[in-house]
Amino acid sequence: MAKVRVRQHVNPLSHKYRHPIAPPDWNQVYQDMTQPLHLDIGCARGKFLLQMAQVEPEINFLGIEIRQPLVIEANQERERLGLSNLAFVFGNMNVAPEILLQSLPADKLFWVSIQFPDPWFKQRHSKRRVVQPELVIALAKYMVAGGWVFLQSDVESIALEMTERFQAHPHFVRQHQTPWLEENIFPVPTEREKSTYNKGQPVYRSLFRVR
């Protein structure tokens, strides 16, 4: 399958992306609705989840991505592999995130990962970054107690901002005393993670437990 060419960054504040995510019928998506759920926000081409769904078939995976051509491509690959524990959905998680979150199978959201999000370096573009306080509040409401939030970026200032926003909410407890978590908690690295290491550059990670 030919690789889809898309813009690396899209403005999540533009009118095109200012609509709530339309949840599918999850009963038509997942073969076993009783399995715990891992939500990956900003999944890009979905390669991380396509591998994770095969490595951990006892978990359901959901990838959210704002670039629709990548979602179409990822779902085509999911179908080709016959994965019934994985779905990719197009949308902006910072527009009424509760609509999607409340539609998910109840008491199943155990993992949330946000990995290498678009940094939007300029301060005037800070509202375009994915980890906004409203998203943190919504995740706190719908995640299962004892669940996990995993964050990583190759931009230290962005990793710090994400970490501080989760740390500011009483439902999320940071799990390490060191400034950054050394190892990825998942058995599969993202494409950006591999690229960063190949360049000899650091990755900044944080891990939170849900109260």
Curated annotation (Swiss-Prot):
Belongs to the class I-like SAM-binding methyltransferase superfamily. TrmB family. GO terms for molecular function: tRNA (guanine(46)-N7)-methyltransferase activity. GO terms for cellular component: tRNA methyltransferase complex. This is tRNA (guanine-N(7)-)-methyltransferase. Catalyzes the formation of N(7)-methylguanine at position 46 (m7G46) in tRNA. It holds the Pfam family Methyltransf_4. Keywords: Methyltransferase, S-adenosyl-L-methionine, Transferase, tRNA processing. The keyword Glycoprotein does not apply. Its EC number is 2.1.1.33. Gene3D superfamilies: Vaccinia Virus protein VP39. PANTHER family: 3-DEOXY-D-MANNO-OCTULOSONIC-ACID TRANSFERASE/TRNA GUANINE-N 7 - -METHYLTRANSFERASE, TRNA (GUANINE-N(7)-)-METHYLTRANSFERASE. The keyword NAD does not apply. S-adenosyl-L-methionine binds at residues 40, 65, 92, 118. Pathway: tRNA modification; N(7)-methylguanine-tRNA biosynthesis. Substrate binds at residues 122, 154. NCBIfam families: tRNA (guanosine(46)-N7)-methyltransferase TrmB (TIGR00091). It catalyses: guanosine(46) in tRNA + S-adenosyl-L-methionine = N(7)-methylguanosine(46) in tRNA + S-adenosyl-L-homocysteine. CDD domains: AdoMet_MTases (cd02440). The active site is at 118.
